[in-house]
Design a protein with these regions (language model features):
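Canonical Rossmann dinucleotide-binding motif of NAD(H)/NADP(H)-dependent dehydrogenases/reductases
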Residues: 10-43
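A glycine-rich helix->loop->beta "capping" turn
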Residues: 14, 62-65, 85-98, 104-105, ...
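The beta1-alpha1 cofactor-binding region of Rossmann-like NAD(H)/NADP(H)-dependent oxidoreductases
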Residues: 49-50, 70-81, 114
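Substrate-binding pocket helix/loop in short-chain dehydrogenase/reductase
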Residues: 107-109, 113-118
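A short, exposed helix-loop element centered on a Lys and neighboring polar residues
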Residues: 132-133, 176
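Catalytic loop of short-chain dehydrogenase/reductase
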Residues: 146-170, 175-184, 193-215, 247
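C-terminal helical subdomain
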Residues: 191, 212-303
Length: 304
């Protein structure tokens, strides 16, 4: 007789304090609710007091612990204040889940205004930098921290949203930089590329696409991956993880040997041997600038 397998050990966050930015609605709200349900003490940050307080109240009503915070991540002083809220309410900080952001499609690069660029970059990219920087001394001092940045597949290229793609691509670089900096001091940093039916998705002009998104991509299905990436036991740092509709997968950056002519390289070599430049033969995952530099320094007698 085959014995029934034991139920998997639940993932818990007891004793951990988490900041979730942009947590009043959409993806951030779902992340905050799941963290709260699994034992974390949650700072629910959102510039809308109504929505921040509602999410915090829902966590508390379900038996969890949460407080609302309404400071803007785009303001460095606001980021400092968010961290102070965590320390004041719960006396500690372990998790920084950066989710806040404003703006999306703006049209072509010619149609995108300075004001739109500023709004998008200041929240998605600079806001994530501000809050993580404010929290970093605490995480460093305790030799433990979990940081998540909310990037997007749009960073790989998307029509009609050059500023958004730029900001999200910046988060790729920030994730990798934080992973390198945090490795010796117990801090991990990863990026989530979520696909969920949120307010911005509801603005899609194509009705068929909109309905498909609404049916298959509820925001809460992005939260298991988001929360695992800020758990004590997360096995990675510097990764880009896409999730949506129940799928979770790695998005990798790779480097290839390419064309290497040494000092003899000419413009004509690049033209005539372009197939070697872009060949995927010998490809390997590149996680940092040092990994990419290793293609040049593989035979060096000094350490890169």
């Amino acid at each position: 007789v085959t014995e029934p397998s034991a139920a998997p050990r639940p993932v818990r966050f007891d004793g951990r304090v988490a900041i979730v930015t942009g947590a009043g609605r959409g993806l951030g709200r779902e992340h905050a609710l799941l963290l709260g349900a699994r034992g974390a003490q949650v700072v629910v940050n959102d510039v809308s007091a109504t929505h921040a307080e509602a999410t915090a109240a829902d966590i508390v009503a379900a038996g969890g612990q949460a407080v609302a915070d309404t400071h803007s991540v785009a303001d460095p002083d606001g980021a400092d204040a968010i961290v102070r809220t965590a320390l004041g309410a719960f006396g500690a900080l372990h998790i920084v889940l950066n989710n806040a952001g404003q703006g999306g499609p703006t049209g072509t690069i010619e149609q995108t205004t300075d004001a739109q660029v500023q709004m998008i970059v200041s929240t998605h990219l600079i806001g994530s930098f501000n809050v993580t920087r404010a929290a970093w001394p605490i995480l460093r001092e305790q030799s433990f921290g979990r940081v998540l940045l909310t990037a997007s597949g749009s960073a790989l290229g998307a029509a009609g949203m050059p500023a958004y793609s730029m900001a999200k691509a910046g988060l790729y670089g920030l994730t990798r930089a934080l992973a390198v900096e945090g490795a010796p001091i117990g801090i991990t940093a990863n990026a989530l590329l979520p696909i969920g039916y949120t307010r911005s998705a509801a603005l899609n002009p194509h009705e068929d696409t909109r309905r498909w998104m609404e049916e298959h991509f509820p925001p809460h299905l992005c939260s298991p991956a988001a929360c695992w990436l800020v758990h004590d036991d997360v096995p990675c740092s510097g990764e880009l993880i896409t999730t949506g509709a129940g799928r979770v997968a790695r998005v990798a950056t790779v480097g290839v040997p390419g064309l290497d002519r040494g000092p003899a390289l000419t413009l004509e070599d690049v033209r005539d041997r372009w197939s070697d430049v872009v060949s995927m033969e010998g490809a390997r995952v590149v996680m940092s600038g040092r990994d990419e530099l290793a293609f040049y320094t593989g035979e060096a007698t000094w350490r890169a």
